[in-house]
């Protein structure tokens, strides 16, 4: 039983690291104009599970990282209006900080397409990712927006309680 729990914990940590890396990659693409292939190559060789500037990064589930980044890039034209609808009308997505846009896009993609992960886990994980970059109030906004999007795509999960 302990072996199963340890295996699940390792997978969860690798997925959490993949989410953090995906948000960083999406941010880098938006701010720096890097292409997806360049970002994949850089993260594969320098970030995922390596030491960078004295910080050791957790090994990430590379396939999960690639799925989230590629999915956001492919679906961003459709994802952004979903996020805009969940935001306050006086604060559209274009006014949200770039790092938070990356968090919201990655979380929205995962909520719609990664049904293998419970919605509450997705929301919680991306709130944790947001905490790595922003203050508590902004992370609360991530929670509220992703919760709305989760209820749209995963109504069955919320109907069960």
Swiss-Prot record:
Gene3D superfamilies: NusB-like. This is Transcription antitermination protein NusB. GO terms for molecular function: RNA binding. It comes from the Bacteria. Pfam families: NusB. InterPro entries: NusB-like_sf, NusB_fam, NusB_RsmB_TIM44. Belongs to the NusB family. One of its GO terms (cellular component) is cytosol. Involved in transcription antitermination. Required for transcription of ribosomal RNA (rRNA) genes. Binds specifically to the boxA antiterminator sequence of the ribosomal RNA (rrn) operons. One of its GO terms (biological process) is transcription antitermination. Signal peptide: none annotated. HAMAP family: NusB. NCBIfam families: nusB.
């Amino acid at each position: 039983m302990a072996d199963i729990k340890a295996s699940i914990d390792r997978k969860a940590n690798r997925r959490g690291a993949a989410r953090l890396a995906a948000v960083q990659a999406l941010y880098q693409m938006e701010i720096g104009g890097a292409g997806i292939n360049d970002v994949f190559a850089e993260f594969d060789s320098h970030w995922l599970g390596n030491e960078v500037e004295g910080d050791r990064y957790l090994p990430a589930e590379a396939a999960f990282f690639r799925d989230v980044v590629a999915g956001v890039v492919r679906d961003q034209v459709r994802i952004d209006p979903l996020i805009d609808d969940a935001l306050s009308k006086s604060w559209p997505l274009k006014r949200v900080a770039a790092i938070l846009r990356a968090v919201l896009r990655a979380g929205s993609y995962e909520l719609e397409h990664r049904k293998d992960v419970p919605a509450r886990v997705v929301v919680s994980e991306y709130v944790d990712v947001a905490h790595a970059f922003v203050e508590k109030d902004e992370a609360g906004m991530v929670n509220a927006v992703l919760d709305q999007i989760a209820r749209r795509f995963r109504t069955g999960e919320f109907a069960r309680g």
